[in-house]
From Swiss-Prot:
Protein's UniProt name: Alanine--tRNA ligase
A GO molecular function held by the record: zinc ion binding
Keyword Transmembrane attributed: no
Annotated compartments: Cytoplasm
Residues where Zn(2+) binds: 562, 566, 663, 667
Cofactor(s) listed: Zn(2+)
Chief localisation class: cytoplasm
Reaction(s) catalysed by this chain's protein: tRNA(Ala) + L-alanine + ATP = L-alanyl-tRNA(Ala) + AMP + diphosphate
EC number: 6.1.1.7
Catalytic class of the enzyme: ligase
Taxonomic classification: Bacteria, Pseudomonadati, Pseudomonadota, Betaproteobacteria, Burkholderiales
Cited HAMAP family: Ala_tRNA_synth_B (MF_00036_B)
């Protein structure tokens, strides 16, 4: 039976039992900020189970896309090494919201497994919670499972109700026993039944978990029975498919076999049993569906988990000999397998492939070099020793290797990793950042040697450079040892030192067994470049000769942003006027941030014009030209000198497109190298100073793609083409206003009706005055005021007090006194008297007052006390 057929039969079976088929929710949980990803079928129904949300149905069934990677639920490190761990899986489930309970849930499960899927009954074992006699009796007496195949599991995790067979959503809230169904693969496979010492073997495999939510647990641990118990079940599609297709490993089912074959095709591997192919087949599913749900590779949160999964897949491709982008080419194969069940995948397949290819290209630039670093480090690790934390950190920080990826590689080689050392290196970096760069304290170091010859305009790699000075913690030294932070001065360098708003370069200084990771480059004196970083290996001495290599990827992104800044500056002057002058800038690999003199926010039209002008220059693909000349000649030739910058007699003039500025920074060779220019923000930073931020190249492309994906999602939600969204949003807003008006009218009518009922049934007479005090359920304060006004007019002379308790425990109070009684009784006093009894306060005019409280339990007595309070004042 194919996986698609198994999924379809499951949903159709429960549909025939009165269940509504509910589509899979997003992998990004909509109602649970504590979850990184949707990891089970019940996540989208959590608020239904807790009573916060009502649905039009009481029975539901779904096939839920799920991810367990990152956060509390993380299977990433096990994928590729076990038969059943996945980052992405499908959870088949059926749910009852206060409708049926244990008997039906158990009978449905048994019927589906034995009659629809035709599994041999004698192959099925079940577990129940030790104290759940009800479930035990249903299995034994009604279903007919022999007692020897029903196992009671008690509290086996060290606390009351801490059991494999007792489920709870959190420390408090809905919870209850569960019953798990296991499939026996037979005696030829090692392992014992659940609860036995050999239960971790592979003979008995759990295929379905039936959770019976029948208790509410309070903070003290007390259990109260729920008035309407619920059912939540989950069965992994991949696991049941393995059973029905008579294979032992999930990776042998039809769905995975086709993806594994596709991975073999793209990597050129003939051995389909290779574990790396399993990893790639698993990871393409997780990565593709995460992108479908709007997640993009990044360095934080869900985006970083996606990046880790992609890079793990690429590393396994590299291990198989594939050094070129290949992962994105598996998307069509995935669509062929899962596009029918999940049409959202087919709809954005091109976008998914684009995002994956960009990530492949980004990581591919550093993967090979990083692997060489790792291979070299592993070759030096003595037997039984771990890989040092410094190397772990270098691979993470410089080469983009997630630490779990490096640990994965080490595990294959039988080497542990020094996580404590890695965390220590991370902490050092955090401390350096908090101090605005520990290394930057070295600016102004005493140095009496020759200036550094800068070769970085033409080359990113320079051999034979000589160490002319070394500094550790501000003190000049002759030698630096491995693990020390230091500043290295060279006689020549390709590293650009931070200047003119452009950040300094990063990279490596190497020679033999010496490796110095450059984290920043600054001028410690005019013309003297300090390479700030950490000696990761070897010993470094003054006079040593090194190979200096700049991080080319980072430099390329930085120069794109720097060159775009020049074009943007010129464009701003054209659009806003010649008064625009630079007031500050920051150019780094991620963006350009440009502060300029202007006294008003830019309009959307002005920003669009700036973008159009800059991108026109980019498309013109003009060559960049730099000349060195006298300062006076440069200014006479039209070169723009920047505010606040100091220039010598001789300056460097940069012509890029239509811009000419004095600039010593590094730049693209042609304007077309910028790729794409996009403004992402504009705002004020001081009086008369605006700040604009822009991105270029692959960052700009990714931003545009993200915005387009967001637009398409919005179009899907509003069921309108993207170009019609503004009109559709206006239409929805108008509909909302109309509905709000109708709701208000309905509330007014209901309030009037309720008021009539109260006037007839709840009014008492005290010394000739009509007194009405009542609690009327959940009514909003505005409607409550209207009711009090109506009752005053109808009953006068009268004193009226109405209270309404909301679902969130808040109490609204409104008191009213007719004008002829305000000399003796004040509405504000009345409301204050009642509010004080329910944990609140109130006040207002003599004839009308409002208040509130929070003690719902005290409300009935407080309302009942009004009659006596009025009597005492008449």
């Amino acid at each position: 039976m194919k996986s698609s057929e198994i999924r379809q039969k499951f949903l159709q079976f429960f549909q025939s039992k009165g269940h509504t088929i509910v589509p899979s929710s997003s992998l990004v949980p909509a109602n649970d900020p504590t979850l990184l990803f949707t990891n089970s079928g019940m996540v989208q129904f959590k608020d239904v189970f807790t009573g916060k949300e009502a649905r039009a149905y009481k029975r539901a069934t779904s096939s839920q896309r799920s991810v367990r990677a990152g956060g509390k639920h993380n299977d990433l490190e096990n994928v590729g090494y076990t038969a059943r761990h996945h980052t992405f899986f499908e959870m088949l489930g059926n749910f009852s919201f206060g409708d049926y309970f244990k008997r039906e849930a158990i009978q449905y499960a048994w019927e589906l497994l034995t009659q629809v899927y035709r599994l041999p009954a004698e192959k099925l074992w079940v577990t129940v919670y030790q104290e759940d006699d009800e479930a035990y009796d249903i299995w034994a007496k009604e279903v007919g499972v022999p007692a020897e195949r029903i196992i009671r599991i008690g509290d086996n995790k060290g606390a009351r109700y801490a059991s494999d067979n007792f489920w709870q959503m959190a420390d408090t809230g809905p919870c209850g026993p569960c019953s798990e169904i296991f499939y026996d693969h037979g005696p030829e496979i090692w392992g014992g039944p659940p609860g036995s010492p050999e239960e971790d073997g592979d003979r008995y495999i759990e295929i379905w978990n039936l959770v019976f939510m029948q208790f509410e647990r309070d903070a003290a641990g007390n259990m109260e029975r729920l008035p309407k118990p619920c059912v939540d079940t989950g069965m992994g599609l991949e696991r049941i498919a393995a059973v029905l297709q008579h294979v032992h490993s999930n990776y042998e089912i039809d769905l995975f076999q086709k993806l594994i074959a596709a991975a073999a095709r793209e990597t050129g591997v003939k051995d389909l049993a290779d574990n790396s192919l399993k990893v790639i087949a698993d990871h393409i599913r997780a990565c593709a569906f995460l992108i479908v749900d709007g997640i993009i590779p990044s360095n934080e949160g869900r985006g970083y988990v996606l990046r880790r999964i992609v890079r793990r897949a690429l590393r396994h491709g590299y291990k198989l000999g594939q050094t070129k982008p290949f992962f994105h080419r598996l998307v069509p194969d995935l669509v062929a397998e899962m596009g029918e069940a999940y049409p959202e995948l087919a709809q954005v397949a091109e976008r998914v492939a684009q995002v994956l290819r960009q990530e492949e290209e980004r990581f591919g630039e550093t993967l090979e070099h990083g692997m060489k670093i790792l291979d070299g480090a592993l070759a030096k690790v003595a037997k039984g020793d771990p890989l040092d934390g410094t190397t772990l950190f270098t691979l993470y920080d410089t080469y983009g290797f997630p630490v779990d990826l490096t640990a994965d590689i080490c595990r294959e080689r039988g080497v542990e990793v020094d996580m404590a050392g890695f965390e220590a290196a991370m902490q050092r970096q955090r401390e350096q950042a908090r101090a605005a760069g520990k290394f930057k304290m070295a600016e102004g170091l005493s140095y009496e040697g020759a200036e550094t010859r800068f070769e970085g305009y033409e080359s990113l790699e320079l051999s034979g450079v000589k160490v002319t000075a070394l500094y550790v913690e501000g003190t000049q030294v002759e030698q630096v040892s491995a693990g020390q932070d230091a500043v290295v001065v060279l006689d020549a360098t390709p590293f650009y030192a931070e200047s003119g708003g452009q950040v300094g370069d990063t990279g490596l200084l190497e020679a033999g067994g010496v490796r110095f990771a450059v984290a920043d480059t600054l001028k410690i004196q005019p013309g003297v470049f300090g390479h700030h970083g950490t000696l990761e290996a070897g010993a470094l001495k003054v006079g040593d000769t090194l190979l200096a290599r700049v991080d080319a990827v980072r430099r390329a992104r930085t120069v794109r942003n720097h060159s775009a800044t020049h074009l943007m500056h010129k464009a701003l002057r054209e659009v806003l006027g010649a008064h625009v002058q630079q007031r500050g800038s920051l150019v780094d690999p991620d963006k350009t941030r440009f502060d300029f003199a202007h006294d008003a926010p830019m309009t959307a039209e002005q920003i669009a014009r700036v973008e159009a002008i800059v991108n026109a220059e980019v498309l013109a693909n003009q060559a960049t030209e730099a000349k060195v000349m006298a300062y006076d000649d440069a200014v006479k030739g039209g070169a723009m000198a920047l505010f606040g910058e100091k220039y010598g007699d001789t300056v460097r003039v940069l012509d890029i497109g239509f811009s000419r500025e004095l600039c010593g920074g590094t730049h693209v060779r042609r304007t077309g190298d910028i790729g794409l220019f996009k403004v992402v923000s504009e705002g004020g930073v001081a009086a008369g100073v605006r700040r604009i931020e822009a991105i270029t190249g692959d960052n700009a492309l990714a931003w545009v793609q993200d915005q387009n994906a967001l637009l398409q999602r919005a179009a899907g939600v509003l069921r309108a083409p993207a170009h019609e969204l503004p009109e559709r949003i206006v239409q929805v807003q108008e509909q909302l206003k109309a509905l709000e008006k109708e709701l208000e009218q309905a509330r007014t009518k209901l309030a009037a009706s309720a008021g009539n009922d109260l006037a007839a049934t709840a009014t008492v007479e005290v010394k000739g005055i009509k007194v009405l005090a009542a609690s009327i359920g959940d009514v909003d304060p505005k409607a409550l005021r209207g009711m009090v006004d109506n009752l005053k007019d109808r009953l006068k002379p009268a004193v009226v007090l109405l209270a309404a308790g909301s679902a969130d425990g808040k109490i609204s109070l409104v008191g009213g006194v007719t004008a002829d009684l305000t000399g003796r009784i004040k509405a504000g006093d009345l409301v204050g008297f009642v509010a004080g009894q329910v944990g609140g306060k109130g006040g207002g005019r003599p004839d009308m007052a409002m208040g509130g409280g929070t003690d719902l339990a005290a409300l009935p007595a407080a309302v009942a006390s009004v009659q006596k309070w009025v009597d005492e004042r008449l």
